[in-house]
């Protein structure tokens, strides 16, 4: 089986994770059950998940410098994820995010730092001119999380023109999403994704999201809803993907794992429903342990064989 190649574009962070028995009340002090720091961000986590499944991952992101950049770069090297840093040579610093994980109901709350105003590199439309030669040709699948669209829009359009499937990790609406829709092959959105002027939040209008993308020519659309079934549309055909019931201990990064696994499967066999079902299984598995990578590790700390076997069995 060849290694599927996928390009990921979007955000990288360093997350400081506090695992709590329950969320604290306002104006109180509490002690965490556990403290963990780990690189994060939708695109980074998806790229690492793709790599753990045996794929070749390339990441275009802003990492820059500052005290938090080193662990991010170290993790990418450890997992063989190749990086093109939009912030190279600038004063940009890797964002430090605080994550409160509530063990009582397996939810998480994230506090982001202020948005950086440091100008980043804008990529042109020529893959050969912009990318390292070692990256080879344009990959068959490209995922964007909606961050840095201004800096990467021309390259995304070039990838689309070359025949790549452009996929969106729609965690939330971001500036440029409407223009991006015309390039998309697939949009996989959170239930919190809301088109401006439409209802959103935890009980957002999933049907409206499916219709909005379909009306703009996106053939494959899905809305994830946590532990509830995934609602999806394959060129107008509606279906649901049931999510296995488990005793979830941590949902942090599960959506990112789903996107990385989807891209890995879709790059091998471009069948939307099959790739979505396989990705859902792996994302559910990721909720059994702490963090966005515990699903792929045995107790001894080595990468488990089961994810790769699951990938091969889907062919």
Language-model features: locations:
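Conserved N-terminal subdomain of the carbohydrate kinase-like
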Residues: 28-29, 37, 52-140, 303-315
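Hydrophobic anchor at the start of a short beta-strand
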Residues: 6, 56-57, 83, 166, ...
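Active-site metal-binding loops of divalent metal-dependent hydrolases
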Residues: 12, 147, 257
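Structural motif
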Residues: 7-9, 112, 141-143, 167, ...
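Conserved phosphate-binding/catalytic region of the ribokinase-like
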Residues: 1-6, 203-315
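Glycine-rich phosphate/adenosyl-contacting loop at the front of the ribokinase-like
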Residues: 1-62, 70, 78, 110, ...
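Short beta->alpha connector loops
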Residues: 65-66, 146-150, 170-174
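Conserved phosphate/ATP/ADP-binding segment of small-molecule kinases
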Residues: 153-240
């Amino acid at each position: 089986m060849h290694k599927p190649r996928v390009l990921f574009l979007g955000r990288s962070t360093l997350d400081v994770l506090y695992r709590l028995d329950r969320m604290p009340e306002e104006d109180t002090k509490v002690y965490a059950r556990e403290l963990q720091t780990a690189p994060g961000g939708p695109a980074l986590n998806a790229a690492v998940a793709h790599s753990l499944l045996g794929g070749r991952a390339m990441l275009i992101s802003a990492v820059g410098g500052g005290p938090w950049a080193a662990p991010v770069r170290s993790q990418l090297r450890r997992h063989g994820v190749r990086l093109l840093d939009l912030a190279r040579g600038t004063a940009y610093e890797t964002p430090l995010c605080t994550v409160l994980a509530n063990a009582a109901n397996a939810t998480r709350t994230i506090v982001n730092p202020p948005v950086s105003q440091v100008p980043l590199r804008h990529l042109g439309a020529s893959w050969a001119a912009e990318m390292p030669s070692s990256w080879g040709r344009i990959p068959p699948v490209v995922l964007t999380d909606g961050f840095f669209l201004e800096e990467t829009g021309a390259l995304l359009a070039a990838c689309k023109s070359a025949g790549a499937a452009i996929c969106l990790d729609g965690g939330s609406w971001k500036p440029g999403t409407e223009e991006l829709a015309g390039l998309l092959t697939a949009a996989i959105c959170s239930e919190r994704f809301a088109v401006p002027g439409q209802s959103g939040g935890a009980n957002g209008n999933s049907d409206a999201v499916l219709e909005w993308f379909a009306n703009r020519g996106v053939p494959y659309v899905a809305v994830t809803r946590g532990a509830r079934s995934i609602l999806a549309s394959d060129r107008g055909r509606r279906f649901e993907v049931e999510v296995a019931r488990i005793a979830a201990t941590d949902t942090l990064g599960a959506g990112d794992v789903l996107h990385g696994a989807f891209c890995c499967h879709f790059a091998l066999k471009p069948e939307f429903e099959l790739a979505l079902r396989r990705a859902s299984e792996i994302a559910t598995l990721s909720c059994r342990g702490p963090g966005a990578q515990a699903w792929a590790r045995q107790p001894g700390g080595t990468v488990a064989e089961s994810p790769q076997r699951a990938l091969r069995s889907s062919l």
